[in-house]
Amino acid sequence: MTHDDAVRARFAATAGRVAEHAAGQVEEVRERLLPFLAPAGDERVLDVGTGAGTLALALAPHVREVVAVDLVPELLEAARAAAPENVTLVEADATRLPFEYGEFDLVCSRRTIHHLARPELAIAELARVTRPGGRVFVDDQIAPADPLAVLELDRFERARDPSHHRTLPDGDLRGLFDADRKSVV
């Protein structure tokens, strides 16, 4: 079984619970992120690793369009049930996005990077599909700088959640953005 298969299996089996949890978080996510992201209203947004659509649903009333991507069809179906007309759901891999260079004004990924075997490929894809002058927003777990503590944390997380791959320390995550010439705020 590949890591992607483990991710699909874990979230397919729990899609109903994930969707219920996601629905309860939409307002909180909206309240926390709108002041930070400050959408103007005319943006085309990509939400990578949307899960049951929490971020996509939170942003949808405040932007022109949201395209929400996930690897797990069961999660996309759950998101589709609550999605307004300006949200499009697409089954795709974060490391191989089916979009052209610079298609989006704002590209987001929330609580997804730690599930990826190759986070550097996903960050490169987020950067690739963001228009020049656009923004990339990533919200994920941050590991401590101590490598032994990271190993212990990841072992704990994998025992709790088999879809977990690894948590990156802040410096490593920033380094992935630096490699793609994106500034980190």
Which ranges hold each PLM region?
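Short alpha-helix
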Residues: 166-180
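Conserved small/polar residues in nucleotide/adenosyl-binding loops
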Residues: 182-184
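Conserved class I S-adenosyl-L-methionine
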Residues: 1-40, 54-58, 75-78, 137-164
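Class I SAM-dependent methyltransferase SAM/SAH-binding core
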Residues: 46, 52-96
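A short glycine-rich, Lys/Arg-flanked "PGG" loop and its adjoining helix->strand segment in the class I
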Residues: 120-135
